[in-house]
Amino acid sequence: MKRLGIGTAAVAGTAVLADCRNSGGNRMQDEPPVGKMTFRENPATHDRVSLLGYGMMRLPTVGQGEAEAGKRQKGDETIDQDMVNRQVDYALSHGVNYFDTAPVYCKGLSERATGTALKRHKRSSYFLATKMSNMHAFTREASTAMFNNSLKELQTTYIDYYLLHIIGGSDEEHEPMELFQARFIDNGILDFLLQKRKEGVIRNLGFSFHGDQNVFDHTLSMHDAGKVHWDFVQIEMNYLDWSHAHEINEANVNASYLYGELQKRGIPAVIMEPLLGGRLANLPAPVVAKLKQRAPERSVASWAFRYCGSHKGVLTALSGMTFMEHLKDNLRSFCPLEPLSDREKVWLEGPLAREIMSYRTIPCNDCKYCMPCPYGLDIPGTFVHYNHIVMEGHLTDNLKDPQYKKYRREYLVSYDRAVPKVRQADHCIGCGHCLPLCPQQIMIPDEMHRISSFVDKLKANS
C-alpha cells in the first residue's frame, strides 16, 4: 500500500494540545506577543497579509471540549458561535487578518459562522477568502447562486480572495480536464467571475489545486497566454509533500513542482495543509524526540509552519485552529517568524520526511467531503481511528509479537468506542458514492475493505 496518512481533527487536535502544554521552556507557555505578526505583501494589490491565515474548515463545536485521541466528538453538527467569535477576536488582536472559508466547509455552515464573527469588526481590518465549490451542481444558475449566497452568508459586498475550488479532480462522468471545463468554462462561470473582479466584487481571483498535474499546467498556460490573470494560487505544501507527495499518492503532485511553477510567474502561493491536516503535529515518539533534541522549547507543529513561512513566495499559510491552544501555539510561530536555516530545510525534507514515510497510514485529512455516506458509515472516523493506532506504533497482525494481545485488544476496544458498530468499515458495500468527492483521491472502498479484513483477522485470533 503506497499511502501515507494525514492526521485528523480529533487525533491531531489532541496531539497539538498535548504538545503545546508539555513543551519545555517559557516560550511555549507564555501568551503570544501582540504586534509581532509577520506579514507578506501581495505584489499586485500591496495588501499586507498575515503569514498565518485562519482556515475556517474545522470550527469549534458545542460540547466538544477537549478532544480525546481517537474518538469522534458528540454534537459535531452545532458550531459553537461564541467560541468562534472569541477565537476570531483573539486572532485579529494578534495580527491574523486572512480568513479562509468555503460553501462546503462544516457541512455548509462555515461561511455563516465566519460572517457572523467578522461582521463585528471593521471590514478593512481583514481579508475574506471563499470559493466556487460547485463540485456537485455546476450549471451557470447553480454556480451564480452559490456565489451570491456566499456574499449573503458572509455579510459582505465583496470578497478579497476568491478561488475556483479543487481544480484537478474528477468525477464519475468526467476526467479531470473535462471536469474543469464543465465546472468553469462551458457554463461561463469563469467569465462571470472575471466580470465580478472588474466590478470590484472580487478583489483577487485564484484557484485551489488537488490532483491532476495537466489541469494545473493548463490553468497556468491560460495565465501565460494572457487569457486569465491569476492573482494567487492555493496549493498543498509542507516538508513531507515537498518531495514525496507523488510517492505517497500517485494522484498527487510534489509541492516543489507546484511552488516552483508559481514562483516562475511571480504568483503568490497560499498554503493549505502545512500540517497535513494535523499529521505533522501528531508525529511518532521517535520523530518527536529528534525535533525536541534540536529545539526543546518549540512545539512539533512550529517546525512545519516555519518551513512554509521560510519560502518567500508564500503569501499566507492556512491553519484550521479548532482550539484556542492551537491558535496560541501557531501565533508563537509567526509572531514573529524565525525562518529555518537552509540546513534545517534540507533535514526536514530529507531524513526526517523519510522516517515519517515509514509509517504507512491513510491520506485522509478529515475534511468530510465524503459525508454523509448513503449507507450511514463514518468514513473519516474509521480512518481517524486507524491512523491514530498506526502513529502510536500499535498496529500489528503478527501473532508472535509479544505485544500482540495488548495491541489487539486496544484496537478493537477503541474502534468500538470511536465508531458505532453500525457505521464501521464492515458495512461498506463498495457503492463508490464517495470516490469523486475525495480531494485526496483515496480509494475509499478499498481502504474500508482492507480495514474490515484487518479487524476480522484480529477478532478471529482471540
Report the location of each language-model feature.
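A short, structured active-site edge motif that brings together acidic residues
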Residues: S124-H136, Y162-H165, I235-M237
